[in-house]
Amino acid sequence: MSPMSGLRQQLKMLGTALLGKRATKSVKKKPFTEVEIKDLRTAFDLLDRNRDGRVTANELQFMLKNLGINVSDELIHDLIREASHSGNGLINEAEFLQWVGRIQALRDEQHSHEDSKDSKPVDEADDVTEDLIAAFRVFDRDGNGFITRDELQTAMEMIGEPLNEQQLEQLLVIADLDQDGRINYEEFTRLLL
């Protein structure tokens, strides 16, 4: 299995969970497929940095920051409070799955409303581009537009796919087309697509 396999899907699911509209109203949810549940569990594991089975406000804020999204402490605490049924400021895996389900239902509802209003299909290419940019930001930790060897290694560890030196070197040889020792956005997208 390639170290990059599933990364885009994992980040897309995480992005849906973190960037969707706040899910406060009652909406009709579609049940998740087995693949979606697996991906959501992976996304939860990405958030749960200390592996205690719960996501804290700090863990959520850390991931958002790595996605290039700066949000206030107040918004982070609102998101956690909204998702946590126990009111303890922590989200367990079951609460996370329910929360994402509500967010997806809201997104589906919003897309269907926009489609009926504009009579335009949802442009999937825009979704892919947004996913790729979010994924690139996770890897490009210093935001300089390039993924260095160290950033690649750190990001792969963060998503639960640690690489040994040989695997890291192989990935860089494959991805670094201009052989400048770092991966730019174009090289990154070619690697994932």
Swiss-Prot record:
GO BP annotations, alphabetical order: microtubule cytoskeleton organization
Claim: Repeat is one of the keywords in the record: yes
Binding site for Ca(2+) 3: D176, D178, D180, R182, E187
The entry's keywords: Calcium, Metal-binding, Repeat
Binding-site residues, Ca(2+) 1: D48, N50, D52, R54, E59
GO cellular component: cytoplasm; nucleus; plasma membrane
Expression induction: By ecdysone.
InterPro entries in the cross-refs: Centrin_CML-like (IPR050145), EF-hand-dom_pair (IPR011992), EF_Hand_1_Ca_BS (IPR018247), EF_hand_dom (IPR002048)
SMART domains registered for this protein in UniProt: EFh (SM00054)
All residue ranges annotated as the EF-hand domain in the record: 35-70, 71-106, 127-162, 163-193
GO molecular function: calcium ion binding; enzyme regulator activity
Source taxonomy: Eukaryota, Metazoa, Ecdysozoa, Arthropoda, Hexapoda
Amino acids binding Ca(2+) 2: D140, D142, N144, E151
Protein name per Swiss-Prot or TrEMBL: Calcium-binding protein E63-1
Signal peptide bounds: none
Pfam family, one: EF-hand_7
CDD domains (UniProt xref): EFh
Keyword Cell division: no
